[in-house]
């Protein structure tokens, strides 16, 4: 669902707008009310604002962005005059459908789970090779939404992105190990739980962040960074934490992660950077494909381990649900020490939502015991339902008006 995040509105940013100066008494007054006086030019025909990658402007403008980054500029309280009202062009019918399908993601997961358990033959055709292609396409679609500038933004936000990265690869793996040892899971099930806890952030986290009123741009950056880091962190942590339980082929895990995750992402970024006209055409269809593929990648693991789930699924629900719930909570409260509410929600969701599909694929390819893959299959359901439930809960809690902005464009 990485490509789906392209249609989700991110934080408003002003690209360019022109304002009639008839309501502005003087240049001095204008500069008093603007956060960026050096970027304002005044002429007889009006005030020109030209900003690139600037922070949101406040309190003079209320910004509202759509997928094509159209912006509405409105006069704020305390500034007199009549600024003509305008409204952004509405989403197309296709974009509305994609947004609806995306926000109903938990429903598709539930339906996919039921199909996987009771009619597994409908989804088990998506075996290892096809599963690999599907996951690779999702990584490619995420890359198609990124540019070199997005990686420069990571460098401008080292602390914010870094905390999310550490939460992803420190809090979650330790939680997975402690839960597996405390509940005394069998070696293959414990290994599977540790493996999925060491996987990078899931693409569905971008959608959950959008629903929760978090910072979608930051969510995409964190998912990207953890995805790139997975080539080293996932095999290294799995070997470190689960190596004493079962043999772990760290080199094989690294190679598979590189092939399935990193290569498609890099190809997508390069294509978007050097062939933007071509990718702009492709990107119109990738969201719909992303919705379908993500649903299949959630349903297929359930179908492939349906027999095991019917006999041992109950004993896995508690540890997997506990893993995600604890990650959501710890990620949020640690973030609250340094960041505002919006950023804390974003880091919490990133910490709690893993790429369970990647965990399932790695378990199938590199572990002989089929039980190792079962925790990842259960995680697909727990992660989607827990993350979306938390997002809906937060959506009904307003972000404080004085919430600090921790994200630098």
UniProtKB/Swiss-Prot annotation:
Transit sequence range: 1-74
Membrane topology label: Multi-pass membrane protein
Name of the protein this chain belongs to: Sodium/pyruvate cotransporter BASS2, chloroplastic
Superkingdom: Eukaryota
UniProt keyword annotation of tRNA-binding present: no
Main location: membrane
Coiled-coil ranges (or none): none
Pfam families attached to this UniProt entry: SBF
Tissue: Expressed in developing leaves.
This protein's UniProt keywords: Acetylation, Chloroplast, Membrane, Plastid, Transit peptide, Transmembrane, Transmembrane helix, Transport
Subcellular location: Membrane; Plastid, Chloroplast envelope
Biological processes, Gene Ontology terms: plasma membrane pyruvate transport
MF term (GO), any: pyruvate transmembrane transporter activity
Role summary: Sodium-coupled metabolite transporter that plays a crucial role in pyruvate transport across the chloroplast envelope. Is required for sodium-coupled pyruvate import into plastids.
Family statement drawn from the similarity comment of this UniProt entry: Belongs to the bile acid:sodium symporter (BASS) (TC 2.A.28) family.
Transmembrane segments: 97-117, 128-148, 161-181, 185-205, 216-236, 250-270, 282-302, 314-334, 374-394
Residue numbers carrying N-acetylalanine: 75
Effect of deleting the gene: No visible phenotype under normal growth conditions, but plants show increased sensitivity to mevastatin, an inhibitor of cytosolic isopentenyl diphosphate biosynthesis. Chloroplasts isolated from mutant plants lack sodium-dependent pyruvate uptake activity.
Listed GO CC annotations: chloroplast envelope; chloroplast thylakoid; membrane
């Amino acid at each position: 669902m990485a490509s789906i995040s392209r249609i989700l509105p991110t934080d408003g940013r002003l690209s360019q707008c022109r304002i009639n100066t008839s309501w502005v008494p003087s240049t001095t007054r204008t500069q008093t009310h603007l956060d960026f006086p050096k970027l304002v030019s005044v002429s007889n025909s009006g005030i020109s604002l030209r900003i690139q990658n600037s922070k949101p402007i406040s309190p003079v403008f209320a910004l509202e962005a759509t997928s094509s980054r159209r912006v509405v500029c409105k006069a704020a309280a305390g500034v007199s005059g009549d600024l003509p009202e305008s409204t952004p062009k509405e989403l197309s019918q296709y974009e509305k459908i994609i947004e609806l399908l995306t926000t109903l993601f938990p429903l598709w997961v539930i339906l996919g789970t039921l199909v996987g358990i009771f009619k597994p033959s409908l989804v088990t055709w998506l075996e290892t090779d096809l599963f690999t292609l599907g996951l690779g396409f999702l990584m490619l679609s995420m890359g198609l939404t990124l540019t070199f500038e997005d990686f420069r933004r990571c460098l401008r936000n080292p602390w914010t992105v870094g905390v999310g990265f550490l939460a992803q690869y420190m809090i979650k793996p330790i939680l997975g190990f402690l839960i597996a040892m405390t509940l005394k899971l069998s070696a293959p099930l414990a290994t599977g739980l540790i493996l999925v806890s060491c996987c990078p952030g899931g693409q569905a986290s971008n959608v959950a962040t959008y629903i929760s009123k978090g910072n979608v741009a930051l969510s995409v950056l964190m998912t990207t960074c953890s995805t790139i880091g997975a080539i080293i962190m996932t095999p290294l942590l799995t070997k470190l934490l689960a190596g004493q339980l079962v043999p772990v082929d760290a080199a094989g895990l690294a190679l598979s992660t590189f092939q399935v995750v990193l290569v498609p992402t890099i190809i997508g970024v390069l294509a978007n950077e050097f062939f933007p006209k071509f990718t702009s055409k492709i990107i119109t269809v990738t969201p719909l494909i992303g919705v379908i593929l993500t649903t299949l990648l959630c349903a297929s693991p359930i179908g492939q381990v349906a027999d095991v789930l019917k006999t041992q699924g109950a004993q896995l629900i508690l540890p997997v649900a506990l893993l995600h719930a604890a990650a959501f909570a710890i990620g949020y409260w640690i973030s609250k020490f340094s960041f505002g509410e919006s950023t804390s929600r974003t880091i919490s969701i990133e910490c709690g939502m893993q790429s369970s599909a990647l965990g399932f694929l790695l378990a199938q390819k590199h572990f002989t015991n089929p039980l190792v893959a079962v925790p990842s299959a259960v995680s697909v359901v727990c992660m989607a339902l827990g993350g979306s439930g938390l997002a809906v809960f937060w959506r009904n809690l307003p972000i404080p008006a004085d919430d600090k902005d921790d994200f630098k464009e």
